[in-house]
């Protein structure tokens, strides 16, 4: 058992040591895209200078536009920055342009390789983040331009609508004046018609009287009619002149020309808006096509990663061999730990054995004390039972002497049974706790069982003794009397 615990402790210690040493450097060397973004906003430093060669390509076209060599060199420079800031030694080739040798030496040490691979991965995340932000800004700018164009069109439309409303009001005012003139002319024409009708009627009457007067009046009326007709024509000509004046005024004010210009501008704006919308749709289609190309490139990258993983597995096998060599260096430490743990476990087990022995001794003492107390209680109960038997014998003698005097039998039986019941109840009370502990039966249940058993025994013995001396009939009557006495005294139990 000690050897098994020793082996488990050594394995756990080795795994924890390896895990902590590898992950502490990984946590110290890894950068997220948000952290790189934040660093690039600060004054230029080591990390910023390492990211500067690929930053513009990342912003414009994403990680796929970055040359793998540039990405590799930036990752190496970032790793060097971290090593220098942490005070960790690193291969000298990483300070020069001999990146192949640098990467090969970084792969020999898990901590170095973790830092380099984390930076290489974070560069991809950073490029994807900044390229997407750039695309987002371009789309927001395009949307802002479309919004501005639409706002200009809306403003021009409202201005045109306002001017059209003003012109409409002016035209309605002119038409109202014309309508008033027409109403006046209508009234005059109606009055003239009524006057003509009256005159015709008068003419019909006077025609026969004076034809010459009629012809003169006809000529006069014709003259008046021509005069009125000329007046109507003049009014219409005046209205036409007013209309020409209004149109000329509108032309002079440039309202008609403004309406034509607003119309042409609206058409141009709508045409520009349509062209911008078509351009936006074409850009969206091209973006979708580019996303498809990126997905295809991702598939090829995954295939390249699979081949790279195969090479990595070979390197891992080499690393395992190196770890086996390194394991011999830990052997001395393991031996020291094993001896120390063995000593600790020996002390611990000895202490546990001592405490266990003390606990067992205490248990033995407690069991012995309990058993002795139970034996003493049993002996006491047996003595009390024997005393109760002697008392019962004396009571029985009294009982037999009572039967000699038949007249006092009920009273004697009552006294006898009552004293017997008291003794029986006392015996049961004294012994029930002991036998309930031995038989593992509840005290109340055991007391009831013993009481009813003793009562039945008493009745049976009483019936047998009385029947032997007085016969079965008298015995039956006496037993009934005893049962009545017992029934009447059950509450005293």
From Swiss-Prot:
It comes from the Eukaryota. Residues 1-22 form the signal peptide. The keyword Transmembrane helix applies. The keyword Membrane applies. Its main location: endoplasmic reticulum. Residues 23-445, 491-493 are lumenal. Belongs to the KAR5 family. Required for nuclear membrane fusion during karyogamy. This is Nuclear fusion protein KAR5. The lineage of its organism: Eukaryota, Fungi, Dikarya, Ascomycota, Saccharomycotina. The gene is KAR5.
């Amino acid at each position: 058992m000690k050897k098994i615990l020793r082996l488990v402790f050594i394995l756990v210690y080795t795994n924890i040591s390896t895990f902590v040493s590898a992950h502490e450097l990984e946590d110290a060397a890894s950068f997220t895209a948000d952290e790189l973004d934040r660093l690039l906003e600060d004054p230029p430093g080591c990390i910023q200078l390492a990211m500067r060669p690929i930053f513009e390509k990342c912003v414009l076209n994403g990680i796929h536009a970055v040359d793998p060599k540039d990405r590799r060199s930036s990752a190496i420079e970032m790793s060097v920055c971290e090593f220098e800031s942490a005070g960790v030694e690193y291969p000298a080739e990483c300070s020069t342009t001999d990146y192949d040798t640098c990467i090969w030496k970084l792969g020999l040490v898990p901590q170095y390789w973790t830092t380099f691979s984390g930076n290489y991965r974070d560069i991809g995340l950073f490029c994807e983040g900044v390229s997407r932000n750039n695309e987002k800004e371009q789309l927001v700018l395009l949307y802002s331009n479309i919004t501005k164009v639409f706002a200009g069109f809306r403003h021009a439309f409202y201005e045109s609508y306002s001017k059209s409303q003003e012109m409409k009001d002016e035209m309605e005012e002119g038409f109202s004046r014309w309508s008033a003139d027409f109403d006046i002319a209508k009234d005059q024409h109606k009055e003239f018609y009524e006057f003509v009708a009256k005159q015709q009627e008068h003419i019909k009457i006077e025609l026969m009287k004076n034809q010459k007067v009629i012809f003169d009046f006809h000529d006069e009326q014709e003259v008046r009619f021509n005069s009125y007709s000329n007046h109507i024509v003049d009014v219409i000509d005046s209205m036409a002149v007013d209309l020409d004046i209004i149109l000329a005024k509108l032309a002079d004010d440039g309202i008609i020309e403004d309406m034509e210009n607003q119309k042409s501008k609206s058409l141009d704006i709508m045409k520009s808006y349509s062209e911008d919308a078509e351009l936006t749709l074409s850009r969206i289609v091209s973006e979708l096509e580019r996303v498809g190309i990126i997905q295809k490139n991702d598939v090829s990258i995954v295939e390249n990663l699979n081949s790279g993983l195969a090479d990595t597995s070979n390197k891992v096998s080499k690393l395992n061999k190196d770890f086996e060599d390194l394991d011999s260096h830990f052997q001395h430490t393991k031996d020291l730990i094993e001896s120390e743990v063995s000593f600790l476990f020996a002390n611990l087990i000895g202490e546990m054995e001592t405490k266990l022995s003390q606990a067992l001794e205490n248990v033995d003492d407690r069991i012995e004390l309990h058993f002795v107390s139970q034996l003493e209680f049993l002996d006491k109960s047996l003595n009390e039972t024997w005393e109760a038997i002697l008392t019962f014998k004396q009571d029985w003698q009294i009982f037999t002497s009572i039967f000699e005097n038949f007249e006092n039998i009920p009273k004697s039986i009552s006294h006898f049974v009552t004293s017997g019941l008291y003794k029986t109840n006392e015996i049961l009370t004294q012994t029930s706790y002991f036998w309930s502990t031995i038989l593992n039966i509840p005290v109340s249940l055991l007391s009831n069982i013993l009481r009813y058993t003793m009562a039945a025994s008493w009745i049976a013995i009483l019936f047998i003794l009385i029947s032997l001396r007085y016969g079965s009939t008298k015995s039956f009557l006496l037993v009934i009397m005893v049962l009545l006495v017992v029934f009447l005294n059950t509450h005293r139990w």
